[in-house]
Regions:
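A transmembrane-helix-recognition feature enriched in membrane-embedded lipid enzymes
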Residues: 132-163, 212-221
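Catalytic core of membrane glycerolipid acyltransferases/transacylases, capturing the structured
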Residues: 169-230
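A conditional alpha-helix N-cap/helix-loop micro-motif detector
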Residues: 157, 207, 229-233, 263
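Short, flexible loop segments at the rims of nucleotide/cofactor-binding pockets, characterized by
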Residues: 94, 151-155, 225-229, 260
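Short, hinge-like loop/turn segments at secondary-structure boundaries
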Residues: 99, 179, 219-221, 299-302
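Phosphopantetheine-dependent thiolation modules in NRPS/PKS and related acyl-activating systems
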Residues: 1-130
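Non-catalytic C-terminal accessory region of glycerolipid acyltransferases
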Residues: 1-7, 234-357
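Conserved S/T- and glycine-rich ATP-binding loop of Class I adenylate-forming
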Residues: 72, 175, 251
């Protein structure tokens, strides 16, 4: 045991110090600036080494990585290609990518703080632009299909919906439901009135909507397929562009389907877009969808579905958005969705109790 402990301690000591090659790299003044920026942004107590993994060692999630990249680009004066940045994992890889890009483009990002710099540039991906500008005729076709979905769900899934009167007369806004199953999207869309439906758009994972028939169908109802992990910047810029055009975005803040049906941790994408574009977020609570089509099941089964639309959450009127702004707005959104979801479950439980009596 003592020998194992000694080996672990020795291994830790070695891992806490840079190698000779890394020490040479760290001696560069630009690298020192970059490492200082990374150290300030990291929430981890671990030392920032060239080999440190941005996610596993330093705790940067996908959103925080984008913010870090912007800070480094502003500090070093280079703008790395988003596709290159999405493929780096360590401190050294990230810093080298930005240093190598310095001078290869007309100039660094505008001197704006954080997400302002990211969202100041519109996406140039033709797939994004095509999806956002699909025809109104196609939208009407999907709207009629949604009426059939709503009727089918009311008859066979005993769908019950409340709070639709809280939806605004017009956009732009963000609609944020919790995510339980593949039924969520069609059912929520089927409840949107035409005045809003005609200008709705969606950001979906390219894992599902990136190719084949689903990719074709997605483009016809304004779904932008992106990889939120490796191409988060494109996803956020697509959301921002649509909102700037007066459209309204359906965005699932959990980013994936719940394992057990309960709302999980919310990502801050909706909060960032709301704060920077000054648009409200309308929370939506879904229940019963997980019972109908849980993860791992090939086909859905019959189960009572419930949807509740909530009051809008307005972004704070702050002159400068900060990490604390995003955190508070995200917590408020999750708290509102969780409260409504619990209300739906309590009502369902009370009705089952009355029926049993």
């Amino acid at each position: 045991m003592a020998g194992e402990r000694s080996m672990a301690e020795n291994g830790l000591a070695v891992a806490s110090e840079p190698t000779a090659d890394e020490a040479v790299w760290l001696a560069d003044p630009d690298v020192q600036k970059a490492v200082s920026t990374i150290r300030k942004a990291s929430k981890s107590a671990k030392p920032v080494l060239p080999s440190s993994n941005l996610e596993l060692d330093l705790g940067f999630d996908s959103m925080e990585r984008v913010e870090l990249v912007v800070a480094l680009e502003r500090e070093l004066g280079g703008e790395a290609d988003d596709r290159v940045v999405s493929q780096v994992y360590t401190v050294r890889e990230l810093v080298d990518a930005i240093l190598q890009a310095r001078g290869s483009k007309p100039g660094a990002r505008p001197s704006l703080p954080g997400w302002d710099a990211v969202l100041a540039t519109d996406p140039d991906d033709p797939r994004v632009l095509a999806a956002l500008n699909s025809s109104r005729l196609l939208a009407f076709g999907w709207f009629l299909f949604g009426r059939l979905v709503a009727l089918f769900m009311r008859v066979f899934y005993r769908l019950r919906v409340s709070g639709k009167e809280k939806l605004p007369k017009k956009g732009p806004f963000i609609l944020s439901p919790n995510h339980q199953s593949f039924l969520d999207g069609p059912v929520v869309a089927s409840q949107i009135p035409w005045r809003l439906f005609k200008d709705m758009f969606y950001v979906g994972t390219s894992e599902i909507f990136g190719k084949g028939l689903l990719n074709f169908l997605g483009r016809t109802f304004r779904l932008v397929p992106v990889d939120p992990d490796s191409n988060l910047v494109t996803a956020m810029r697509a959301g921002a562009l649509g909102l700037k055009q007066g459209k309204s975005l359906v965005l699932y803040p959990e980013g994936e389907r719940s394992i057990d049906g309960a709302p999980k941790k919310f990502k801050k994408g909706a909060a960032i877009l709301s704060a920077h574009l000054s648009v409200p977020i309308y929370p939506v609570a879904l229940d019963g969808f997980h019972d109908a089509w849980p993860r791992g099941r090939k086909f859905p089964r019959l189960s009572k579905l419930r949807v509740r639309f909530g009051d809008p959450i307005e972004p704070p009127a702050a002159e400068k958005n900060s990490e604390e702004t995003y955190k508070q707005l995200t917590e408020k959104l999750r708290g509102r969705v969780l409260e409504m979801w619990r209300g739906l479950r309590e009502n369902a439980g009370a009705k089952r109790s009355v029926a049993a009596d």
